Amino acid sequence: MGFPPRCIGQKIPEGLHVRMNLETGVTEAKLISNDKPKNALKMIEDESNNFPEKTSSESENRKTSYKNYEELKKDFNELNLNPKTDAEILRELIEKHVDISKQKDRDEEEILTILEDLEFLVHQYDNANDFVKMDGFKTIVYHNLNATNSEIKRETLKLLGSSMQNNVNVKIHALETGSVDILLRILALDTDMSVKYRALFALSGLLRDFPYAQLKFVENAGLSVFSKLFESDNLKIQQKMLTLINDLLQEEIDSKKDTKQVEKIKQYEDIQLRKRLIVHNYCDHLNKMIVNSVVIEANDHDIIERCLGALYLMVDDCSSKLTDKSKDIVLSLRNLYRKLSQNESVDGDPDYFGTLYDLSNAIVQRIQKIKVEL
């Protein structure tokens, strides 16, 4: 279930929760109601035309029709117009989830609605912290990840991943309560690929910009789990893993640029991600992905870009293990993107193919240089 967009300039009623969708750039709004959870989403309508101008007689009537405070308070209570704080809504949703979960014939659709509402709320930094303080990880996240319903597990993993985005407090709590092992177990054992994909989303939220969690990931056989997934035929999951590994490698490179951050540099060095990747046959997996990106998804330049980016980051370590077919593909891609950069653009960006040409050309030149040095 998606979230309705809000047009700029529209009035925002009290109790309405608004966020910016970082994927689309659209401002979205959501009215969360515990009374009618299945109808929680509402379009915001422009209310400016719903109120006609008041006549002088109406103004006079208004002057003589004031109610005292107690009467107004009573009316507001009857209309349920007292807006609740996000913390109050969070607590009510958590309590409602606990109550439903105890029922023998629990309403799984209602649980999904609660998870969706919670996921919306935890995008806000303070709400995510409150979710942790209210024991949401134990009572909701970890409880649901033991469920048999794949849809509930998917939505719970989305909730988990969203709560950790750029929130170090939640990440620390997730790490201390065993999230790494739980997510790796799902990636290794769950048979539903859509659940695995969501588990990767949550794992990415935990590992990014958190070297201590990255260390726990590699120490707990995380790269072994990844290696098995690279051997599968699911290109979407492989692409997700590739993106995460690229980001983690780039983090390590960036950490060395600030020589004052001695402790941070040491943390990344302790991970030894590059060496561990080689041990877990990452170069072989790159070979396979480079070939598949062209053979299976020949027109998907985004996948090709990620594969080239991964190879660029590991070319010094993987050049000797690249097959002739992979090298020929990189050469062909360089020639292709040279031509495309001269003639075409993507989404109005004339530099897109030029960037891909520069990337593939840098890889070719580096491979040739390494060959000469040997």
Residue ranges: model-predicted function:
Residues N129, I172, Y212-L215, K275:
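Recurring C-terminal helix/loop segment of individual leucine-rich repeat
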Residues V132-R185, M193:
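Helix-rich alpha-solenoid scaffolding regions
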Residues L93, H97, T139-Y142, I182-I186, ...:
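Buried hydrophobic core positions in alpha-solenoid tandem helical repeats
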Residues Q124-Y125, N166-N167, F210, D317-C318:
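Short loop-to-helix capping motifs
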Residues D75-I152:
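Internal amphipathic alpha-helical repeat/solenoid segments
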Residues V132, Q272-R274, K327-L331:
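Extended intrinsically disordered, low-complexity coil regions enriched in Ser, Thr, Gly, Ala
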Residues D135, A221, F230:
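Residues that form ligand- and interface-recognition hot spots within folded domains
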